[in-house]
From Swiss-Prot:
The keyword Cytoplasm does not apply. Residues 1-19 are cytoplasmic. The lineage of its organism: Eukaryota, Metazoa, Chordata, Craniata, Vertebrata. The gene is Dipk1c. A motif (May mediate ER retention) lies at residues 18-19. This is Divergent protein kinase domain 1C.
Amino acid sequence: MARAAGERGRAARCGRWRRGALLAFAAWTAGWVLAAALLLRAHPSVLSERCTDEKSRRILAALCQDYRRGWLTGALCEDLCVGGELLYQRCLYYERGKKVLQAQWRGRTVVLKSKREAFSSFPPLTLLEEEAGAGAPGIPEAELLLMVAGEVKNTLGLELPNNSIAPLWPARQGPGWRQQLASAWSLLQQEEYVYFSLLPDLSRHILPVLGSCGHFYAVEYLAAGSPHHKALFPLDDAGQAQAISHIALSFLDMVSHFDSDFSHRLHLCDVKPENFAIKRDFTVVAIDVDMAFFEPKMREILEQNCTGDEDCNFFDCFSKCDLRVHKCGAQRVNSNLQVICDKIFRHWFSSTHRSPAVSLQLRLQLQQAVQECAQHGGSSGNSWTASSSVFWKLRWLLQATLKELQEAEK
């Protein structure tokens, strides 16, 4: 009997040890999963493919093969695949399936982009498959526009009138019309292409599309910002302080455009130097808008289940957790301006030792205004009201700084 009790005791201890080991292993695994998730969130390029010339040339060769087979078309296909007027130069980057390549087009440097590598990887237009038979009746334009409007709504979260959608879609049937439809449909499934096609007429801070071939589209090449640049952007040492003031003012202009000039506010959820470039006149241009969302889509993204505020952070767009219902609020609590102040302006204006041509008092005021701007919102949730006030303060201080720098040159 004592022996049986001893065996039961050893079995109980063994069971407790196994349970403890399992719990420890589960905690260890959860820790690594969390660490991996945080790493991927901060550095999405970790899982990116290696960007090589060989792979990039192979991708474009496959694109041209699909063009010759009559599967796709576009204004740039002839120059790329036949005429030799659009020439590959180098691979810029691959990230999360997206392919970004540099090319030379008729003496102009351009960037070729696609969300996916192969044309066949995009879901086809259902109506085209249904009407694929020879002599099949034409697809009603009303049906097509309805599908396009639905895809745009799914992409942007916006309902647009037909006249706004027109630039995205081939107007009338004719030779090669099916290839045009198939190509346009693959482009419509790329959020950035839709932004670049619809918004440049409304804002100078968005790149226009120059043309396309199948699922690849071309935009102007502009040197992107980088944390490796001392001034975040490629600027000459001479006149750098003036250039930074001009660029900062252009960032403010962009914030104003994105907050006010569209039917809904446009939220930037991935603010970093690499996603912006500057033109020769120091105009800031958003060159990567994969993480930009209009208000309806932003609300949909933010409104998720939560156990704390940290669950309501979507990259640079933050919400707050309502612990009564364990749901993130649909309203963003920080702003584009706040994030730009934090991630861009702090780098330029965090020290009063810069720009000796500018008075110490003005440098100190600008430093304090940037600090105030970067810290607004988040806890109070009143970031939009606060941003409006600090926006005008920053604008006045930057204009005053620019004036002092220009007068010092005389």
